[in-house]
UniProtKB/Swiss-Prot annotation:
This is Photosystem I reaction center subunit IV A, chloroplastic. It comes from Nicotiana sylvestris. Its main location: plastid. Residues 57-73 have a biased composition (Low complexity). Stabilizes the interaction between PsaC and the PSI core, assists the docking of the ferredoxin to PSI and interacts with ferredoxin-NADP oxidoreductase. Residues 1-49 form a transit peptide. GO terms for biological process: photosynthesis.
């Protein structure tokens, strides 16, 4: 019965990798070559080619430091402040027309329900907090 050696099945192996992350105009290629052929009495050879990269220009070190940019004014806070008493206007809510206190308010304008409200009374699932949209609550004076 004939047998096959995996080393003889893959007689040559070549890898060529271009330097993609280079920010210079020169390109660099690294090549690896493995051969299972025996050339006379020498063992198989490994060939590696590599090019040295040029040193980055030192222009950034000699440039004068730029002035700090003027900070833009903070946008006004979204929603009620923490601890504010609010009335719930969402009709399908367990706490509809009830009052609770604001625990947190997400400042991201893309958040659908940014206001977290905590209540003294728990609902049927034994939960005492819920998230609401800005138009589903009103502040109680």
């Amino acid at each position: 019965m004939a047998s096959c050696n995996m080393a003889s099945a893959a007689s040559n192996f070549l890898v060529a990798t271009p330097n993609v992350a280079s920010n210079t105009n020169t390109s660099r290629t690294t090549m690896l070559f493995f051969s299972s052929k025996n050339y006379g009495s020498t063992a198989p050879r490994l060939v590696v080619r590599a090019a040295e990269e040029a040193a980055p220009p030192a222009a950034a070190a000699t440039a004068e430091p730029a002035e700090a940019p003027v900070k833009a004014a903070k946008p006004p806070p979204i929603g009620p402040k923490r601890g504010t008493k609010v009335r719930i206007l969402r009709k399908e809510s367990y706490w509809y027309k009830g009052t609770g206190s604001v625990v947190a308010c997400d400042q991201d304008p893309n958040t659908r329900y940014p206001v977290v409200v905590r209540f003294n009374k728990v609902n049927y699932a034994n939960v005492s907090t819920n998230n609401y949209a800005l138009d589903e609550i009103e502040e109680v004076k």
